[in-house]
Amino acid sequence: MSKTIDIISLGCSKNLVDSEMLMGLMEANGYKCTHDSDDPQGEIVVVNTCGFINDAKEESINTILEFAQAKTEGRIEKLFVMGCLSERYLADLEQEIPEVDGWYGKFNYKKLLKDLKGEDFVACEGKRHITTPRHYAYIKISEGCDRHCAYCAIPLITGKHQSRPMQEILDEVKYLVSQGTKEFNVIAQELTYYGVDIDGKQHIAELIEKMADTEGVEWIRLHYAYPTHFPFDLLRVIREKKNVCKYLDIALQHISDNMLTRMRRHVTKEETYELVRRMREEVPGIHIRTTLMVGFPGETDEDFEELKEFVKWARFERMGAFAYSEEEGTYSAEQFEDDVPEEVKQSRLDKIMRIQQNISSELEAEKVGKVLKVIIDRLEGDYFIGRTEFCSPEVDPEVLIPAAEAKLTIGDFYDVLITDSEEFDLYGTTIIKTI
């Protein structure tokens, strides 16, 4: 009888893809896989960790300790750990948590299966076990990052940027379409750098255009672009291809030249304003999601005022913000004193988010009375929950449609009349099924 393996995936969607790849390999080798179990159901547990920021490290360590206790109590047989945390802190972790049967990094996790299976190991690249609802999936197009922003530990963990071969990505898309996937959320640590490590040129627009031309691909959504040397031909693809969502996730981090220089972002205030302006001009209706940081070392009141004015001007449809926290080994940790008091960081964070909350409420209210294409994700209580092309899974607003109104099908598209809005969610009524 085959053993059951629980894969516990922590952190970002890029980690989730790694977990799904491992699950596909496990199943091809005769194991039954479950995922994200609160109560371990399998004889073997694999924890895929995140090591990006302190909160993520704590979550990863606590999860490992939880399953180490389960092993001590005899509720599971074996415990393995993989991912970013073990990639960065392997020696310390091995010493501190001896209950773990095997430690694997971010890139050698396939060795885990070889160690379990021995000579009978079967390789089957590309056969992912999708853990999201079947109608959408994440497509990881590269690993690593060459940008070396002052505050970021990602290059220390994942190394240099490595683009996946374009045909390999397109083959994966075709395979997922055959499995029922309609929506593809393209992810990378630095999306717009795709291809540079191969031949010195950015090929992201070419890749997305070819994905859009693949039969069965209904939506493509782009995540984690970078403002420096932004490839403007990508905007043409977003504008012209109907199945490329008018949505772009691009972390801008700050606007003052002082902060951008200290952060080693290699972009200026003027260039950032021009980038946002061109996005709005070349792709009418585009929804921009960005991430900002407050409290970086040396941030003055004047720097923060510039940031507030930028947010008011840009009117981002989606925005997240974080207070700076020092990450060991990064340029900022080694070169700068963390000199902005915690209470000032929190105050600035609260202020910038209040500005954005008002903007978000106003922009969502403008959708009332419009008919939008919505994909249905799930039934929850009295409502079917869906998303428009402007909404990425997990992080963006959702559309709530009364379940009593009509029987909708999970994973199908409907034209929905938006009838009301809240700060982060919309309410609607179905007009017609579109796909």
Q: Which ranges hold each PLM region?
A:
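Conserved, mostly hydrophobic/aromatic
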Residues: C149, I169, V186, L222, ...
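Conserved beta-strand core positions
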Residues: I5, I44-V45, A137, F184, ...
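Active-site proximal loops enriched in glycine and acidic residues that flank catalytic Cys/His/Asp
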Residues: A188, Y224, L252-H254, T290-V294, ...
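Short flexible coil/turn linkers enriched for glycine and charged/polar residues
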Residues: T131-H135, C145-D146, V244, H254, ...
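Conserved SAM/AdoMet-binding glycine-rich loop
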Residues: E77-G83, R88, L93, S178-F304, ...
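Terminal RNA-binding accessory module
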Residues: E334-I435
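Extended hydrophobic-aromatic, low-complexity segments
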Residues: K246-Y247, L260-T261, P284-H287, E302-F304, ...
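Proteins enriched for Cys/Gly/acidic motifs involved in redox and nucleic-acid/cofactor modification
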Residues: M1-Y194, D233, L248, E270-R277, ...
